[in-house]
Amino acid sequence: MLTMGGLDVESVEPVAPAFDKIVVGRVLEVAKHPNADRLTLCKVDVGGGTTLAIVCGAPNVVAGMKAPVAMVGARLPDMEIKQVKVRGVESSGMLCSAKDLGLSQDHSGLLALPAEAQLGADVRRVLDLDDQLITLKLTPNRGDCLSLLGIAREVSILTGSPLAVPAVAPAKAALEEKRGILLQDTAACPRYCGRIIRGVDAKARTPDWMVRRLERCGLRSISAIVDIANFVMLELGQPLHAFDNRAIEGEVIVRRAREGERLKLINGQEVELAPDVLLIADRKKPLALGGVMGGEASAVSGSTVDVFLEAAWFNPSAVAGRARRFALSSDAAFRFERGVDFAATPEAIERATQLILDVCGGAAGPISEAVATLPQRKPVRLRSSRASKIIGVQFSDEQIAGLLKRLQLPHARSGGEFTVIPPSYRFDLEIEEDMVEEIARLHGYDNIPSRPPQAKFTMLPAAEGRRTLSELKRILVDREYFEVVNFSFVEAQWERDFCGNAEPIALENPIAAQLDVMRSSLMGSLVANLRFNLARKLDRVRVFEAARCFLRSSGGEDPRDPARALAGYHQPLRIGGLAYGPAAAEQWGVPVRPVDFYDVKGDVEALLFPREARFAPLAHPGLHPGRAASVSLGGAAIGWLGELHPRWQRKYDLPQAPVLFELDVAGLAAVNMPQYREISKFPPVIRDRSMEFDEGIPVSGILEELARNRPPLVQNIRLFDFYRGKGVERGKKSLAFRVVMQDTARTLTDAEADAAMAQLTELLAAKFGAKLRT
């Protein structure tokens, strides 16, 4: 039930293992064993006029004490009791320790039972051992369930049973004395209650029932006053603290710590405080870490006569993280970090006062209270239609109203809309989805039908004029590249070295000290991949990555561009690759040579095919000054390729320079649509022409000019030879072009072919000053 209600039950265990025939007995006489120094002979009254002779080895056995007696035939967790002789003396049973009963690991002596326990009564009933210990694994937002009251409230909600909260009558003030309270930090502590109780017996014995309940909740008994404070915390969820009233000088002050201030805590640890730590102090000194742990100097002890009892509400933000900073763990901090009911503070101090007066005696004064601005619970809107849509179950307005009533949430209704005022103990109810969750868990998660979502999908035809990222990746994989996936954050030094980026986009909270900036290029990550593989003895590496890079926006981007996802920043999707080592995998039929610029240029051209890119010399901080090129399509730059700069090759300990490229995916996606062209049935005419050009004229510019201004008969022009040397002037180069001419209607004559070649020669001479080489 609790698990399905949202409170995860981690385990349900009995508080004691199974055993029977264990009764309450009183030790009447204790005599020395005749044959053993460490054993005693005990006469034990087990009620009903029955007296047993039992041999016992416990050091704490004394006449008059009451202890558990295992009768002959009793079954304990580890043994069965029989009538036996112990060193020649008959023993009719066994006096038991807590370990014998499986209640704890304490085997130092007999388990002493309360003096009022009835002789012969079943120990399971006397110690309330037929109980179950339920361990809950609460989520951080359910701090309201860190108490018996909170769990009882949930059970009431889930079952519909009425919640019976024991009434706590205000203690009648037998004193007029009050201690002043000053709140210097009202945001961190807007409510503080305190009460003086004089004449307490600090050495009073904690009731057995309270000790048992504390132990079952994982708390050890310390002293009656401290035990009562802990018990009320478990019962109502409000942490309390008891000060020795004599240790407080003047009024109680809630303030921030001063730089360098120190406090010794009740666990013996001395801590140095910082100004963001909340303190409970008096006029002269700190007394406690607010909401975390008390100080040793002001703690109650066996000599305490007067107590100042504290109950306060601390803002979770003022307590969160403070215990961890000092390596502390306290139940109070655990609760205050998650949120405590700020309306229940007076009730908690009244309950603790009642128990202290009952157990320790004394006289209570009136409650001193300082209250500033308490948290205001903002109304939360809940629509029936919204709840039905999210949960997948149709709820009527009346059903929603009924569920809110069971949840004990005050609300106002207007049609199908409810305005809910979250109670003071529910800090987790802030938005409409929180309320929908409450409706769902109360309705029952197992009552929500399993309905797979249904949607109509229409397959859209793939655009012929665009390629997907998967297609681009497949091209590189076919060319022996392996895909890698790297972090988008890199070392700042990589950005400075490879990109010349002196001010990369810095991360506020990097996952590692060295990964502190966002990358503006894939280059650094690919070089890191290369070094990783070289360290593992690979001599041929081909890797690529398709990912976003991060740049500061220049302001000229299209606001509809998906790469401009955040104002002020540009996040283009790029594909980059790196090639290193032999151009081809080693095999007997191919000479071994290192990969070069032109090998990777071929890979880039394969990515762009059937479109033709323009490659132009490029100065790039990460690339070799003479072996780098920009890549343009349709007059727009889309990336670069080149060999790594020798400086970075040496710095990053690379035996040879890799060749890299990086292209914008947006520029690669578009492809030319195929155009129909009639296939000629007439033979082509093929002519070669060799021309001399100035050394500085790029071949790409020549080919582009020929493509733009070729005669209609020319179908294709291709460079097939390049020559420098004998017969060519210094500062000149010889380029040989193969020209294919063809007509779809007739066979070309030599005169027509000669005229077309002459036209091309004149074009090159006029545009580039080229001379026909004879």
Predicted regions span which residues?
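Phosphate-backbone binding interfaces of nucleic-acid-interacting proteins
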Residues: 1-175, 308, 324-327, 331, ...
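Conserved mixed alpha/beta core segments that line enzyme active sites in large multi-domain catalysts
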Residues: 10, 26-53, 211-212, 229-297
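Class II aminoacyl-tRNA synthetase-like tRNA-binding/catalytic domains
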Residues: 81, 253-293, 297-300, 447, ...
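Mobile "lid/hinge" segments at catalytic clefts and subdomain interfaces of large enzymes
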Residues: 90-100, 106-112, 123-125, 132, ...
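Extended, well-folded interaction surfaces typified by the phenylalanyl-tRNA synthetase beta subunit core
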Residues: 150, 380-541, 687, 740-744, ...
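Terminal amphipathic helices with adjacent charged low-complexity linkers/tails
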Residues: 155-184, 360-387, 393-394, 435
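Glycine/proline-enriched, intrinsically flexible loops and inter-domain linkers
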Residues: 159, 163-261, 354
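A carboxyl-terminal module marker
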Residues: 389, 406-412, 419, 428, ...
